[in-house]
């Protein structure tokens, strides 16, 4: 922690005090000054084991506004499967924490595990009584997210997929809300009571 603070302070000081360093206009755009290498496009600081690249031109992220309505999801089901219970527990904690940080309601349940057994010969050229049995246990976790917009779902899914641990698979099922098509008429059961009332009179 202290080392990170020292390097952060050093980087800020170099960034603010970069006006004091002179950049010579030689064949290359790199100048050497007291063990520091400076470039016009990138400020590069070198110590014995420290390399800090600080971009000179920081661009602000652009926000785009589109006229299209955002996609609405009624439910987003994320099924995660793996072979190690501790890894799944840790990933479940991470995914729930990320969902709560984004203000998404999440429910977690654990489907029953699946066990596959293979009984094989110990070697190809051996008698049948010499066998070995292999067992694969697949554990599952299911995260149910409800009432999401398309942009929130995309951000959340990209975040948890980038941090997916090794040996863990993910399956995502999306249930989208859509408007009722115009070609579908009114339900038949709304018109039936009126016809029955007319036939009685």
Swiss-Prot record:
The keyword Secreted does not apply. GO terms for cellular component: mitochondrial inner membrane; mitochondrial small ribosomal subunit; mitochondrion. It is found in: Mitochondrion. Disulfide bonds: none annotated. Keywords: Mitochondrion, Ribonucleoprotein, Ribosomal protein. Gene3D superfamilies: Ribosomal protein S10 domain. Pfam families: Ribosomal_S10. Component of the mitochondrial ribosome small subunit (28S) which comprises a 12S rRNA and about 30 distinct proteins. Belongs to the universal ribosomal protein uS10 family. This is Small ribosomal subunit protein uS10m.
């Amino acid at each position: 922690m202290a080392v990170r603070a020292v390097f952060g302070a050093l980087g800020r000081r170099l960034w603010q005090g970069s006006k004091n360093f002179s950049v010579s206009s030689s064949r290359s755009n790199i100048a050497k000054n007291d063990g520091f290498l400076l470039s016009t496009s990138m400020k590069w600081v070198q110590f014995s084991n420290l390399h800090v690249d600080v971009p000179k031109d920081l661009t602000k992220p652009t926000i785009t506004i589109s006229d299209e309505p955002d996609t609405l999801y009624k439910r987003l089901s994320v099924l995660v499967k793996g072979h190690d219970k501790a890894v799944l527990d840790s990933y479940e904690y991470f995914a729930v924490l990320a969902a709560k940080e984004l203000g998404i309601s999440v429910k977690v349940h654990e489907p029953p595990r699946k066990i596959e057994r293979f009984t094989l010969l110990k070697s190809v050229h051996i008698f049948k009584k010499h066998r070995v049995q292999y067992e694969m246990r697949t554990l599952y976790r299911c995260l149910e997210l409800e009432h999401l917009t398309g942009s929130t779902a995309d951000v959340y899914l990209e975040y948890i997929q980038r941090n997916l641990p090794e040996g863990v698979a993910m399956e995502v099922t999306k249930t989208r809300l859509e408007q009722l098509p115009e070609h579908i008429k009114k339900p038949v059961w709304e018109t039936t009571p009126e016809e029955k009332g007319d036939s009685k009179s």
